[in-house]
Regions:
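Tandem-repeat/low-complexity and Cys-motif detector
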Residues: 31, 84-88, 115
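Short, low-complexity, Pro/Ser/Thr/Gly-rich segments in the mature regions of secreted, periplasmic
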Residues: 120-129
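Aromatic-rich carbohydrate-binding modules that target alpha-glucans
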Residues: 1-49, 58-80, 129-130
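Non-cytosolic coordination micro-motifs
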Residues: 114-115, 122
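Exposed beta-strand face motif in extracellular beta-rich ectodomains
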Residues: 50-52, 95
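Helix-coil boundary and N-terminal low-complexity module in membrane systems
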Residues: 54-56
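Structured interaction patches on ligand/partner-binding surfaces of diverse proteins
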Residues: 61-110
Length: 130
């Protein structure tokens, strides 16, 4: 996809913005960088240690496909107990959010859709304090 969408809680579009709480209609777009499978966006993270998820389809559409965390490094501190959730940093501030899907993904048709990596490399999620 050309963009993926982050939603969850304990973040906002700006420091003075309304804290988000799992509202797909106000999801943060992470835009694809060139021809890579890296997606980036910037948001403000509060210190409440929230969780997020990434939607791979239109966040307000009828079918919402979330990125499973099973294809990320199992030792990563960003993984959450929920199979599609990731933990936010606990230091408050603006962050660049970067998701690297390595060789890309394939999303199957049908209910439920299955997300499959196009290669064997583990995906990465990075938070860079700005």
């Amino acid at each position: 996809p050309d963009a993926i969408y982050m939603y969850g809680w304990s973040w906002a579009h700006s420091a003075s913005g309304t804290a988000q709480s799992w509202q797909p209609e106000s999801a943060l777009p992470l835009v694809r960088v060139g021809d890579s499978f890296v997606y980036e966006g910037t948001c403000y993270v509060f210190s409440w240690a929230g969780d997020i998820a990434f939607i791979l389809t239109n966040p307000t559409g009828n079918t919402k496909v979330e990125l499973p965390n099973e294809n990320f490094d199992a030792n990563s501190s960003v993984l959450s107990g929920n199979p599609t959730h990731f933990s936010l940093p606990t230091t408050e501030g603006y962050y660049k959010i970067s998701v690297d899907l390595k060789e890309g993904i394939t999303i199957s048709e049908g209910e439920p859709s299955i997300v499959t990596p196009n290669g064997s490399s583990k995906f990465t999620l990075r938070y860079t304090l700005q």
